[in-house]
C-alpha cells in the first residue's frame, strides 16, 4: 500500500511542473517548502505578487487533492471501529525501502508544506511575529524522531496484546525490501528528562513519557504464521502531571 501511495504522489508531483513556483523562502525552522525543491527567493521576486498568488493557489489545490487521496486510501486500510476502538491511533509511519529513508513520512512533509502555504500568504511582519522561535515558544517535552528497522525492534505488541516478531524484509516482485518505522520518543539527552518544561514544581510532579500508536507491519506470531498486523511503536512524547499532596 505504501508503494501505491508513493506512485500516486509522484504522478501528482509531475503535474506540478507547470506551476509558476520557481523560488520560495520562509523564515522559521528551516525551509518548509515544496519537498525536493531548493528555495532561494520569494514568489513576488519571480513574476510579481499576482503571479506568486496564482502559483500558491495552484499548488495549494494540488496538494489538497493529494492529501484527500491519501486520506481516502488510509481509511480503506484501517480496521472497522466496531472491531477495535484503537483503530484511530493508526498512523502512516511505515515505509518499505531498499535503503534508509532520508526524509520523514510523506504525510509529515505534506503537513509541513501546508504550513508553508499558510505562512506564504502572510505579510512579512505577521510572518516574522508568527515564527515560534521569535515568540520564544518551546516544547513541553523534548523528543527525537528517527527511522528504525525490524533489526532494531525485533519484537512488538499487536492489537490483541500478543508479542509478535517483526520481519525485517518484505518480499516484492523484484526481490525484497526492508521495513522501516518512523518512531518518535522522548529525548533521554534533552533538558526535560527531569520533568516537563514550564511546570510549577512547587505544586506538580511532572514527567515526559513516550506514548505509542498502532501501525501496520509484516509480522510473524508464535505459531509461525506470517501476516500483516497492527503493532505498537513509539510515536510521541507527552507530559504527565500529578498534584503534590501534603503541602
Swiss-Prot record:
Disulfide bonds join 141-208, 186-237, 196-239. One of its GO terms (biological process) is cell surface receptor protein tyrosine kinase signaling pathway. Pfam families: NGF (PF00243). Coiled coil: none annotated. One of its GO terms (molecular function) is growth factor activity. InterPro entries: Brain-der_neurotrophic_factor, Cystine-knot_cytokine, Nerve_growth_factor-like, Nerve_growth_factor-rel, Nerve_growth_factor_CS. GO terms for cellular component: axon; dendrite; extracellular space; synaptic vesicle. Residues 1-18 form the signal peptide. The record marks 57-58 as: Cleavage. Keywords: Cleavage on pair of basic residues, Disulfide bond, Glycoprotein, Growth factor, Secreted, Signal. SMART domains: NGF. It is found in: Secreted. Glycans are attached at residue 121. Its main location: secreted. Residues 19-128 form a propeptide. Mature BDNF is produced by proteolytic removal of the propeptide, catalyzed by a FURIN family member. In addition, the precursor form is proteolytically cleaved within the propeptide, but this is not an obligatory intermediate for the production of mature BDNF. Can be converted into mature BDNF by plasmin (PLG). Belongs to the NGF-beta family. Important signaling molecule that activates signaling cascades downstream of NTRK2. During development, promotes the survival and differentiation of selected neuronal populations of the peripheral and central nervous systems. Participates in axonal growth, pathfinding and in the modulation of dendritic growth and morphology. Major regulator of synaptic transmission and plasticity at adult synapses in many regions of the CNS. PANTHER family: BRAIN-DERIVED NEUROTROPHIC FACTOR (PTHR11589:SF3), NERVE GROWTH FACTOR NGF -RELATED (PTHR11589). Monomers and homodimers. Binds to NTRK2/TRKB. Can form heterodimers with other neurotrophin family members, such as NTF3 and NTF4 (in vitro), but the physiological relevance of this is not clear. BDNF precursor form: interacts with the heterodimer formed by NGFR and SORCS2. Mature BDNF has much lower affinity for the heterodimer formed by NGFR and SORCS2. This is Neurotrophic factor BDNF precursor form.
Amino acid at each position: 500500500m505504501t508503494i501505491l501511495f508513493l506512485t500516486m504522489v509522484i504522478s501528482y508531483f509531475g503535474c506540478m511542473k507547470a506551476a509558476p513556483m520557481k523560488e520560495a523562502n520562509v523564515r522559521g525552522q528551516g525551509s518548509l517548502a515544496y519537498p525536493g525543491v531548493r528555495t532561494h527567493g520569494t514568489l513576488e521576486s519571480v513574476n510579481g505578487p499576482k503571479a506568486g498568488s496564482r502559483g500558491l493557489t495552484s499548488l495549494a489545490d494540488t496538494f489538497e487533492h493529494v492529501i484527500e487521496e491519501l486520506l481516502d486510501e488510509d481509511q480503506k486500510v484501517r480496521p472497522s471501529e466496531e472491531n477495535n476502538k484503537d483503530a484511530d491511533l493508526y498512523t502512516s509511519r511505515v515505509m518499505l525501502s531498499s535503503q534508509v529513508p532520508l526524509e520523514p513520512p510523506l504525510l509529515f512533509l505534506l503537513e509541513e508544506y501546508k504550513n508553508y502555504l499558510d505562512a506564504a500568504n502572510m505579510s512579512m511582519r505577521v510572518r516574522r511575529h508568527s515564527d515560534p522561535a521569535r515568540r520564544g515558544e518551546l516544547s513541553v517535552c523534548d523528543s527525537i524522531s528517527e527511522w528504525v528497522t525490524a533489526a532494531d525492534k525485533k519484537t512488538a505488541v499487536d492489537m490483541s496484546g500478543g508479542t509478535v516478531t517483526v520481519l525485517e524484509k518484505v518480499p516484492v516482485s523484484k526481490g525484497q525490501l526492508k521495513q522501516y518505522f518512523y518512531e518518535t520518543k522522548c529525548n533521554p539527552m534533552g533538558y526535560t528528562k527531569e520533568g516537563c518544561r514550564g511546570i510549577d514544581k512547587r505544586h506538580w510532579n511532572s514527567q515526559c513519557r513516550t506514548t505509542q500508536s498502532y501501525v501496520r507491519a509484516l509480522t510473524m506470531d508464535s505459531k509461525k504464521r506470517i501476516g500483516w498486523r497492527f503493532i505498537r511503536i513509539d510515536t510521541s512524547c507527552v507530559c504527565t502531571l500529578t498534584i503534590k499532596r501534603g503541602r
